[in-house]
Amino acid sequence: MSAAIQFIRGVDEEVIPDVRLTRAKDGSSGRAIFYFENPNLIQEGKLEVMGMYLQDEEGELTTLDVSAKFVNGKPHAIEANYDMKSEEEWDRFMRFMNRYAESHGLGFSKS
């Protein structure tokens, strides 16, 4: 099974997000900030987003911290925050991201 990101269950988002990661120095917590510029659901006029669902062979990671970004009164982007409160959650998230990158031909770089 490949990894997918969905805003509406059953509908994979095709736009690849910009993902920024932050992590506490002691590894006890972290945050992933996803930014989707002009995602499919905006292009299709579907703005009733209830959450972001990260799906892979291990199951599903979910966040409800999702918001639309507007330019000149029109939806332009979606930003979602996924918080990790333990090293185990961080490790699980990184496994998802590795699968997502692999299934979409992407790479990972530290900045």
UniProtKB/Swiss-Prot annotation:
GO terms for biological process: photosynthesis. Keywords: Membrane, Photosynthesis, Photosystem II, Thylakoid. It is found in: Cellular thylakoid membrane. It is a peripheral membrane protein. Signal peptide: none annotated. It holds the Pfam family Psb28. GO terms for cellular component: photosystem II oxygen evolving complex; plasma membrane-derived thylakoid membrane. InterPro entries: Psb28_c1_sf, PSII_Psb28_class-1. The keyword Membrane applies. Part of the photosystem II complex. PANTHER family: PHOTOSYSTEM II REACTION CENTER PSB28 PROTEIN, CHLOROPLASTIC (PTHR34963:SF2), PTHR34963. Belongs to the Psb28 family. This is Photosystem II reaction center Psb28 protein. It comes from Acaryochloris marina (strain MBIC 11017). The gene is psb28.
